[in-house]
């Protein structure tokens, strides 16, 4: 089976050097997902040749960096022989257009003694007797012929990919992963922009929390382009015991700040250059602009919040699409440790609490459980 893979449009806009790097990374990710076969680059697309019974092909729809792909049949058209193309088109498409209104779409790369319109017209005439008619504006079925120099490719399916950038081209980011609805979606969105996520989870719910986090990450692993996901599980109950020493109204923001501080240490360890969270502006009291400012004050790494402008319905819609929603919805909100959280915490108060608590963030990270998925 031969498959033509069309990279995301933005990859084509990169400089020649960056484009080669992105396409090389995409090819490696495809190899990791498909497990076998031959892949090569050619004039802005990738070709993948695999066994006909390869069951991993459908997984290409979850490989970031792919705009679309199509299983194709091909012939070598010597001396620009249009008759060869017409005969092959009849062989491939006669059953596809049978009893249906159809259209032919053709495109060419290279020098030929015929135009794309010639191909569309001649192939359309050859297929017409098998069909119920032609409608270029609203056909029931479209058939495609793509001629690249002396090879013609025939296909009738265009399967959409997730677009974005190949996972790995943008480096690593440490993701604060609670396991709720938001953090898996934020992780997915950063992978879509080419980042490899390093997952940091504060376990506040024991084995149940751990179970659902692992299930969510198993879903996200299918979108990772073959990259393994590294999970660091911190014992959050030890942190909560510490936080019981400060005022209730400051605890939620202080907990988030502890998470940021541990994430900062993990960035150092994992050679990640950013921290990612699932925070959305004003969604809850800890996510007001003031509290976000206090939470990230003094953190040396950039903090990415891909969901910052999303409402909950939009986030839920994405979670359903990704496949994590069914697990996230079963998980209690463990970070809601105070019913009297303030929407505007004072920075000086939090810094004073932080000094008094004197948490050893390095030790918190050292005592974490590490799992590779």
From Swiss-Prot:
Annotated residues that bind ATP are located at 176-177, 201-202, 256, 278, 287
Q: Which GO terms describe its cellular component?
A: cytosol
Q: In which pathway does it act?
A: Cofactor biosynthesis; thiamine diphosphate biosynthesis
Q: Which UniProt keywords apply?
A: ATP-binding, Cytoplasm, Nucleotide-binding, RNA-binding, Thiamine biosynthesis, Transferase, tRNA-binding
Which is one GO molecular function term here?
CCA tRNA nucleotidyltransferase activity
Pfam entry (one): THUMP
Listed under catalytic activity are: [ThiI sulfur-carrier protein]-S-sulfanyl-L-cysteine + a uridine in tRNA + 2 reduced [2Fe-2S]-[ferredoxin] + ATP + H(+) = [ThiI sulfur-carrier protein]-L-cysteine + a 4-thiouridine in tRNA + 2 oxidized [2Fe-2S]-[ferredoxin] + AMP + diphosphate; [ThiS sulfur-carrier protein]-C-terminal Gly-Gly-AMP + S-sulfanyl-L-cysteinyl-[cysteine desulfurase] + AH2 = [ThiS sulfur-carrier protein]-C-terminal-Gly-aminoethanethioate + L-cysteinyl-[cysteine desulfurase] + A + AMP + 2 H(+)
Its EC number(s): 2.8.1.4
Q: Which CDD domains match?
A: PPase_ThiI, THUMP_ThiI
In which compartments does the protein localize?
Cytoplasm
Question: In its UniProt record, which GO terms are filed under biological process?
Answer: thiamine biosynthetic process; thiamine diphosphate biosynthetic process; thiazole biosynthetic process; tRNA 4-thiouridine biosynthesis
Q: Where is the signal peptide?
A: none
| Domain THUMP residue range list | 54-158
The record's section on PROSITE patterns has: THUMP
| Taxonomic superkingdom | Archaea
Tell me the protein family, please.
Belongs to the ThiI family.
Q: What's this chain's function?
A: Catalyzes the ATP-dependent transfer of a sulfur to tRNA to produce 4-thiouridine in position 8 of tRNAs, which functions as a near-UV photosensor. Also catalyzes the transfer of sulfur to the sulfur carrier protein ThiS, forming ThiS-thiocarboxylate. This is a step in the synthesis of thiazole, in the thiamine biosynthesis pathway. The sulfur is donated as persulfide by IscS.
NCBIfam families from the UniProt entry:
tRNA uracil 4-sulfurtransferase ThiI
Name by which UniProt lists this protein:
Probable tRNA sulfurtransferase
Could you tell me which species this protein originates from?
Answer: Saccharolobus islandicus (strain L.S.2.15 / Lassen #1)
